[in-house]
C-alpha cells in the first residue's frame, strides 16, 4: 500500500492526474464516510461547494435539506488530505475556506491541478462557508 501511495503522490505532484487510487480505509462516522466518498468523486482539476455536497447527500437520503456546515465538519476531519481531496471543496460564491493545512497550501494544490483561480477569493476572518 505504501508503494502505491508513494507512486500516486509522485504522479500527483508532477502535476498529472493519477489513473489509479491506492486502497484507503479512513476511520470516521457513517456521515464522514459518506462525505469522504463524495470527495473522492470530485474530478481532478474541479471544485465543489460545501452546499453542493450537502445537496447531493440530501437527494441521496430523500430529505429536503442537509447542512453545509455539517459537511464542512466532516471535511475538516479528513486525515488523508490530497488522497481524499478536501482541497477541492470551496465555500459558496467562490470563497476559499477551511483547509487544515492552511489556505496557502489549498491554493497551491488547486493551482497544481490547473483550476482557474480567478473566480476564488480568500475571505476575511469570521466569514461563513
Can you annotate each of these PLM segments?
Residues 64-108, 117:
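Short glycine/serine-rich loop segments
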Residues 1-62, 66, 112-129:
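Basic nucleic-acid-binding alpha-helical/helix-turn surface characteristic of O6-alkylguanine DNA
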Amino acid at each position: 500500500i505504501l508503494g502505491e501511495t508513494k507512486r500516486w503522490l509522485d504522479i500527483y505532484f508532477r502535476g498529472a492526474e493519477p489513473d489509479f487510487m491506492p486502497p484507503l480505509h479512513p476511520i470516521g462516522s457513517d456521515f464522514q464516510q459518506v462525505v469522504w466518498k463524495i470527495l473522492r468523486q470530485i474530478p481532478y482539476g474541479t471544485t465543489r461547494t460545501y452546499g453542493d455536497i450537502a445537496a447531493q447527500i440530501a437527494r441521496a437520503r430523500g430529505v429536503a435539506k442537509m447542512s453545509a456546515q455539517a459537511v464542512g465538519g466532516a471535511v475538516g476531519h479528513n486525515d488523508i488530505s490530497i488522497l481524499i481531496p478536501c482541497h477541492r471543496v470551496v465555500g459558496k460564491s467562490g470563497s476559499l475556506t477551511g483547509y487544515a493545512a492552511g489556505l496557502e497550501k489549498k491554493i497551491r494544490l488547486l493551482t497544481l491541478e490547473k483550476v482557474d483561480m480567478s473566480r476564488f477569493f480568500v475571505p476575511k476572518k469570521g466569514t461563513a462557508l
